[in-house]
Design a protein with these regions (language model features):
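Extracytoplasmic/lumenal acceptor-recognition loop(s) of multi-pass membrane glycoenzymes
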Residues: 38-107, 117, 147, 185-187, ...
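Extracytoplasmic
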Residues: 2-75, 166-176
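Aromatic/acidic, Gly/Pro-rich catalytic loop(s) in extracytoplasmic/lumenal soluble domains
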Residues: 106-160, 181
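Short acidic (Asp/Glu) and glycine-rich catalytic loops that position anionic groups and cofactors
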Residues: 8-19, 78-81, 131-133, 149-152
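Alpha-helical scaffolding within the catalytic cores
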Residues: 33-34, 94-95, 125-127
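A generic structural motif
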Residues: 5, 69-80, 131-143
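Active-site-proximal, structured, solvent-exposed surfaces of multi-pass membrane proteins
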Residues: 136, 147-261
Length: 261
């Protein structure tokens, strides 16, 4: 019974997502406050948080808020283009790193302390990164030419910002064009334009795009139903396994002496 109760409590803890849950992260605490504040703007800029030593390099993408179930960063893996750009950036060979990172809506690069002088010099030497600040917690660069999270590339050559939220975006398409989402391609992205579902397309850059044929209201959604369903199925399987492992409820006189000792 104790095992069953523990499993149920564990499942609730994971799904509810408290401050110490497996599906949340307090990674925003290590990002400078002004960068976290900028992440709340309609452009929803992201920050690449980099930790580099002489032997290892780790990174994650921060949106200024803790992660939770349903976020695109949880439901999908990190795009290989970003992994390659980070690898090239550290070695100083990433001439296109800023363009790649910027296309995925990453507007800032934060190198955490302790800062490796070699890594800092490598980033300074690569075009497209403008140093903004250097403090005891690390160094921040702005990525030149980075894209907002959601834009409408109009047919006249202009780009229009579509205000984004933590999950999707809602705004007005002032003219026909392509709505570009600065996220990894995933079939869970949905766009409704003037009440009509718009087919999802996969851009060569790896981004999800939608062709908007007429001006009007557009609503972008990330449908994580399948992802949540998979997690629920995994938890259900775990629960069944624990229940099957519990004592079968046999009478005491039917239990062998070896099991009672």
């Amino acid at each position: 019974v104790l095992s069953l109760v523990s499993t149920v409590l564990f499942a609730g803890w994971v799904l509810i997502g408290q401050s110490t849950s497996l599906v949340q992260s307090d990674q925003s605490d290590v990002v400078p406050a002004f960068v976290s504040a900028l992440a709340q703007s309609p452009a929803k800029p992201k920050t690449l948080v980099l930790s580099a030593t002489s032997s290892t390099t780790t990174f994650f993408i921060s949106r200024g808020n803790p992660l939770s179930i349903g976020d695109a960063d949880v439901a999908t893996e990190t795009p290989p283009q970003i992994e390659d750009a980070v690898s090239q950036l550290i070695t100083g060979s990433g001439v296109s790193a800023a363009k790649v990172l910027g296309s995925f809506g990453i507007q800032y690069l934060f190198l955490k302390a302790p800062v490796s002088p070699e890594s800092a010099r490598a980033i300074d030497g690569v075009g497209g990164f403008t140093r903004m600040s250097a403090t005891q917690i690390g160094i921040v660069w702005h990525i030149v030419g980075s894209s907002p999270r959601v834009i409408l590339a109009g047919t006249n050559g202009k780009n229009y910002l579509i205000p984004a939220s933590d999950i999707g975006a809602t705004g007005k398409a002032v003219e026909p064009g392509q709505l570009v989402v600065a996220e990894k391609y995933d079939r869970s992205w949905r766009l409704i334009s003037n009440g009509v579902n718009v087919p999802l397309q996969h851009a060569p850059s790896g981004l999800p795009v939608f062709s908007v044929s007429s001006p009007g209201k557009v609503t972008l959604l990330f449908d994580a139903t399948a992802h949540r369903g998979l997690i629920s199925l995994q938890l259900l399987t775990l629960l069944i396994a624990v229940v099957m492992a519990l004592p079968s409820g046999r009478r005491r006189r039917q239990v062998p002496l070896e099991e009672l000792v």
